[in-house]
Each structure stands twice: as structure tokens, then as C-alpha cells.
Amino acid sequence: MPFGCLTLGEKKDYNSPSEVTDKYDLGQVVKSEEFCEIFRAKDRNTLKMYTCKKFNKKDGRKVRKAAKNEIMILKMVKHHNILQLVDAFETKKEYFIFLELATGREVFDWILDQGYYSERDTSNVMRQVLEAVAYLHSLKIVHRNLKNLVYFNRLKHSKIVISDFQLAKLENGLIKDPCGTPEYLAPEVIGRQRYGRPVDCWAIGVIMYILLSGNPPFYDDGDEEDSDSRDKNLFLKILSGDYEFDSPYWDDISDSAKTLVASLMEVDQDQRLTAQEAIAHEWISGNAASDKNIKDGVCAQIEKNFAKAKWKKAVRVTTLMKRLRASEQGDTGASGLAAGATGGPPDPNMPGGSLLAASIKTALSEKAADAQTSTIPSLPQPPAARPEEQQQAQQQQQAQQQQQARCNGDVPQMLPQRKGY
């Protein structure tokens, strides 16, 4: 049965579980991810191996939505640097997605095994990623969770493929829900602005930064046990574009590479380089990438930074922001007063909480005031308040927000089109 749309009132025609098992032999679970379990599957007729993703409907609405979304997107795309959809089934209890099997290693692991690694190797990787993303963007598809790059097989000149389209979305001017992996998030996602295809270009800039230095562009040096403070500081650094090409890690990297990274990691999404523009950059399409061996320095930093990191795990950023809000309210008990610290009420749609909202505004105002330097803004500390004052302030703020919503009609604005998209 083709996995397609049903007409209004038509009875749902599910696949039977035997349709799946009669065609494919599912092996043991290879790994479990946020939304699904991953299997190696063998076609019983051709004996060809595939990757199978199984989504259990009982795991909730988000899982069901992720499965349907990935199927919809994968049915739209066909590109040699994108892992292709082979088959899809929906039973009463599960979704099954069968994909091409990528047997190669992740790019980070590949680098660690090389005897020689240079900017030209990175340029080759980034060119393939940019071509895939430019193709997606031509279809108005936003991936929203670019990070895991793998080689399709273990041959010497294997291609790079991207996958994991559970969070991908068609750009219609209304994307605002935050999701993805925190360290790869663009400023507009954290700031709860409406966003679109430029978020993928930011993530590509983060990936390129890591591949050239072995370090993440944004990190917090604070107490690793205080996860809320660490995440908050990470978000503030991303919002203000607070990263450096620090020595000695960037000493041997060409100016052309640094220029491309900076253009992809431009805080203003309207000024950020598009995927197609990045492909035309001299470091990608020309001969600007250096062939100097940078393997030792990059590998040392990759092993140091990513052995204990959580970067490979996608999280719902909404959940993270809510946790920060709960922590802040527990510390200050003054969510209604933080508005006074910034001259106005925080965005009612922003789940990051009062202090995070104030910090965002502080970070952005400092960035605008001093475009030449990137500093970590100090967090405003609202004064302590009595419980009755807190309750009164919260009630007043809620009433103002409700009145504003009635006056405005909550009509969303369309995302302005950028040249090149």
C-alpha cells in the first residue's frame, strides 16, 4: 500500500505487521533515538541491506508527528548527498521507514583515523553538505537539526550523506517553535523570532568551525554541574555571536576559511550567507583551501571536547528553556519584575522565562551598541519582592498580555524573503 493521503471520511487502511515482516527481515536494534528505534533490515527477495526506523505510536503525539513528517519530507527529495527513502509502512501501532544503509563512519571518527587531514578535506566535506542543503532550500525545506554527517560507505572517495528529517519543516513564513541541538542553534531560534532556511546555514558554519579547529565555537567555562547556568550562558553567547578564532587552534587556518565561517555565522539572519552563495565562495569552489596538515591539532581537540559532550543528542529546546525558567523563578520568585529590568514585558510567547528574556534583550542591545567586540553580557538581577507583590505583578502582566492579544488579533507576520532564496 502506498503511504499517501486519504480523502475526507475515508476509512484508514493500515498495513498489517506481516506485510513488513514478509518483505523485510528485521535484525536486532542497533540503537535507540529520541523518536525511534534503529534496525538493520534485509530485503528477503534481494538480500539487500537497509536501515529501518520504527516509531511506536504509543510513545506520544510528538513521535507520531515526527514519523509522518520524515516520510512526507523524504518522499519529496532525491539528491545523492541525502539518504534516500526506500519504503514506508503504517500499521495500527507503528510506523516503519526503510532507508538506504550508510555503512561509513561519522566525519569526526573519519578525521581521527586519518594520517593526513587538511583544509581541503574539510572543504570537500562542506561542499557536499552545502549542495545538499541548497537543494533542500530550493524546495523550501528547512532541516533544522544539521549536525550528524556520515560517509555513505568506507571506500576512499565515499560521498557524504545527511539524514534525520524528523524535525525538518516546509518554510511557510510561520516557523517559530524552537527545536534542535542547543550548540548548533541559530540566534533567531533562541530569541524566538520567526525563522527559516538561514538557520541551516548557521549550523553549517558551526560544523565547519569544529572541523577546522576541533573546538565548538560556543561553550561555557563555568561549573559543569550547574547545567542551567551553563545552558543560559551558552544561549547568551550564541545570541551575541560571542566566538573567536583563538590561538593556537586557528593559527594555521587560512583567512579565506575564517571569512566563510564568519559569513555563515552572521548573527543577522538577513545578512547571513545562503547555501548557494557559500558554494560559490573561493574556499569551496576555488583553490583557497590550504593543503597543510592540521590533523594533530584538530584530533587532539575533538577527543578532548566531544568525549563527554552531549552534542549528538537532539533535544526539544522548548523543554530546555522551560527548565531554565523554572530554575530562575525558584531563585528569584519575581517573574513579573524582570520586565522592569529591561523596560518592558518579555515576549509572552517565549518559554525561556523572565530572566532569560531580560538577558536576551541585554545581549542584543550590547551587540548593537558595540559591533566591534563580543562580550558576555552580565545578567540583570531583579530586586527581591514580597509574595503579595509578586502575585500582583504577575496578574497585571497576564491582563496586559491578554488585552494586547485581543487588540492585535495575534496575526503572525510573514517571514521576509531574502535575496538568494
Swiss-Prot record:
Question: What is the designated name of this protein?
Answer: CaM kinase-like vesicle-associated protein
Q: In which tissues is it expressed?
A: Ubiquitously expressed.
Question: Compositional bias (Low complexity) spans?
Answer: 330-340, 390-406
Recite the UniProt keywords alphabetically: Calmodulin-binding, Cytoplasmic vesicle, Membrane
- Coiled-coil spans are none
Its Gene Ontology cellular component terms are: cytoplasmic vesicle membrane
Q: Which PROSITE patterns match?
A: PROTEIN_KINASE_DOM
Localization: Cytoplasmic vesicle membrane
Q: GO molecular function terms here?
A: ATP binding; calmodulin binding; protein kinase activity
Q: Where is the Protein kinase domain?
A: 24-284
Q: What does this protein do?
A: Does not appear to have detectable kinase activity.
The protein's matches in SUPFAM superfamilies, at most eight in alphabetical order, are given as:
Protein kinase-like (PK-like)
Q: What membrane topology is annotated for this entry?
A: Peripheral membrane protein
Give the Gene3D superfamilies listed for this entry.
Phosphorylase Kinase, domain 1, Transferase(Phosphotransferase) domain 1
Note the subunit structure.
Interacts with calmodulin, in the presence of calcium.
Q: Where is this region: Disordered?
A: 326-421
Principal subcellular localization: membrane
Tell me the gene name.
Answer: camkv
In the UniProt record, does the keyword Membrane occur? yes
